[in-house]
Structures are given as C-alpha cells and as structure tokens.
Amino acid sequence: AFGHLFSRQLALVEHLGFVPKQSEDERDAMLVRLEYACQTNDFRKPSGAPLLDLAMAMKEHPLSLLGPSEMQPVLIRFKNQLNENSGRFARIGVVPEMNHNELVAWGGVSDDADPAREDQATLFLTWDGLQKRVSSRIDWMIEHMPTDYAWRIHGEGTSLLEVLLHHCIVMDWLTIALAFLHGKDPAAIRPIQALKAYLADEASV
C-alpha cells in the first residue's frame, strides 16, 4: 500500500512543481540503488546480519527515534511501523526542537534526568545533507548519550527523496525482524480490525 500510494502522490507533487522532477535516468538509477538496499538489508541473507543484530539489541529496551526536521516524515513512519509490525511503542524527537526541552530528560552531563534514560535504545536517523549546526547538535548528543544502546542509521542517496526512501527500506526490514524476535506476525493487526468492525457495527445502528 505504501508504494502504491506514495508513487501516485509523488507524481502529483512533481507535476504541480512542489518538488523537482527527476529525469528518467535519475529515477532509474535511484530505483537500482534502492533495490540494492532492499536486497542487502534482508536479514534472511548474510548481508542482513548487522540489521538482525541491531534488532536483537533493541528487543528488550524502550525505543527512541531521533533525527533532524527533514527526517520527521520517516521518524513518524518508523514509529508507526514499530507499533504495527512489531507491536512495540516508540517515541520520536526532532532536532533542533527537542534540544530546547527533551534534552534535559536525557541528562548526560547532569543527574537531573529521567530515571530510565540509561535503558533507552536510541536510533539517530541522519543523512549527508545535514545542516552543519544540526549535525553538531547530534554529534554532541551522541557523545553525551547516557545509554550504551545508541546507534546512527545513515540514509543513503543523492537526494533527500532517495534518502527518505532508503530509511523506509531499512525500517521495514528492522521492524519485521523485531516482530519475529517478539514472536509476532508482522502482518497481524487484530486490534485495528476489531476497531473497524466495532465502528462498522456502530454505524449500522
């Protein structure tokens, strides 16, 4: 569903001129690179072993997702995929805004911090196009993170669009791996189905 909806929305915003339109060669090259990312992050293959190791390290910890404002769409999607695929809660923080408040709860240079901060599994979503000051903020946070469970996931690509899609591929494999580690079918969405059935019954009254 994601690919079906996204491709049509992308075609529309390109047609309206909201984002630069890619040439056929650029689009084809991007799709080749994204297909490679899809294949190499498959945790059923040897190349996907690092992703599976990451999922195993995340399994027993509360999850935090942090990144710059331009990564906010994939931060939200990542949280949603963890909720739906893995049956896990996750929260997101956007840099630099979270540096003005949430940073206090992380501590790192002070004891005035959340008691559970050291148990957080934290993923930083980054890319080559990070604004310099934002990059410095993230580097400072990584250096002062009070948890041993912190990783940087770097989006690959020659454009922001490609980087966002690359992050989506990695998060899909990661949340599916985490689902299996928890013994959950990543396609199982019984609470959503139950809610829809309840609303349908209520509407028919």
Predicted regions span which residues?
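A SIS-like phosphosugar-recognition module
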Residues: 1-205
